Amino acid sequence: MLPLSKTIRTLLIGSGALLLVMMLYYPFGYDQAAFSIGGDMVLKNGAVPFRDFLDTKPPFIFYIYSVALFIFGHHDWSIRAFDILFHFAALFYFYKVLVSVLKDKDHALLSCFIYVILYTTSGYWMTAQAETFAIIPSVVIFYHTQRFLSGKGKPLGNALAIGLASTTLFFLKSTLMTVPVASLIFLLMRQRDKKTYTFAFASIAATLILSALYIYYLSSVGALVRLMEVFVWVQDYGGIAPLLSWDTITSVYIQRFPWHLVIIYSPTFLAGAAICLFFIWKSKRGNKTLTDVQYIYLHLGLQALLGLLAVMYERKCFPYHYSRAYWAMTPLIVAGLMHVISYVRTVIRPNYRKYVYALILIFTLPPLYRIGSQPIRWTFVELAGMSRAQVVEDTHEHYPLKEMQQLADKYSPMLTANDNVFFWGNHVGVYFYLDKLPTTITLTNTPLVTSWSPKNWRDTMMSQLRRSSPKLFITERRDFKGFINFTEMDSWENLQAWNSLRVYLDSNYTYSDSVGVYRVFMRKTAL
């Protein structure tokens, strides 16, 4: 590719860094609130995920949030500050790895810049997710596989690095294990000999041993049984949309998945990746020997393919699910677009080139538009002195961020340090803004309201609720999330349907007030 000027490089680095810093002003989303509360429990109470609280995500995301809160304190922007610093480090590492394997600094820089655009423009709800923090272990696996193939480093050291990274991915989210699987497939495609089989075995063994050590830890602290229960529960949770039903095929695989894919990446970026892989296929079909760089693109293409297949398997297709493949897609995008630009410069007449470039720009509009609608917008809201919570409710009427803060402003002065609070609902930022921690296993009530929820979870929650005797009992209305918990009732209706919880509330609490969707009950007497 043509070398970039020093000015262009400086602009790319500066604008990319600015986009990352703008995330500091992103509001507190639904998932970020739940992860922060779990992280706060880990930090302040030494809580163990699954044993002390339930969620649909594996445990490592809560440890990450606990680190963010430890460094920056109890603020809704703490995870944003941590995410920014994390990405500065992650992208620097990604850049160094790409330079090492591709031998092209400009290609590496453009790949990192496109990654920043894709990630920061996904918005406040879709950032700081489990997939977000998968970039470093994913790149570690990719890099150490390539190091082994090129004969660099000690095989055992490379295998241990892959094992540690794979374990991290598994406990961030099990479907992220497509990364080591893709590298293993590529490894065995590339060369098959005793040394390679030994390396593959060592990598798998390291993953199993390190995973077993963490599982042993969970067992030793009494969390393993519930971990297994959560694993079974999540299988049903993921099966809300059956894998091969006609409805899933038409609504998810044919409509939602490809539509979100195009909107997130843009037709231009997808075409760039496809063109890169097309030229590799063309070389293979012509029985030409692939270059080392083409093999690297093939490795990245396999990573992107399996990552996107995992998104289809999960069947939720939220934008953040696609972020697991950003790191693998961006070098392919750059390579493909360089092919296009080279073609335009050599084949298209100079008078028409500007029209071709304009067309390329038009087909890149989805992420470019979101630069204005996400990082720039939220920065403007903050600098203009506007209420982010009000803007959130104006644009996302079903996410009551402003009402969480209003509830906290009203009731925080009534609570002492020793007073407990119980929340029954989905939008658990209430806990965070009240600066209170759950005293039951319930963060969001999703794990307890599904038809397949284990009875012992409900029994445990009721026992903990009676023992902690919270001063406030807060429940939520109009938070129906059938696409998540497969129920047609909101949290208040679910409470009424659960006889034990309804009787407990009626017997021990009196209605105090409503703040938007939240109904607040005050304890009658000491229980």
Residue spans for each PLM region:
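Transmembrane-helix signature of polytopic, membrane-embedded enzymes
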Residues: 6, 94-117, 135-136, 153, ...
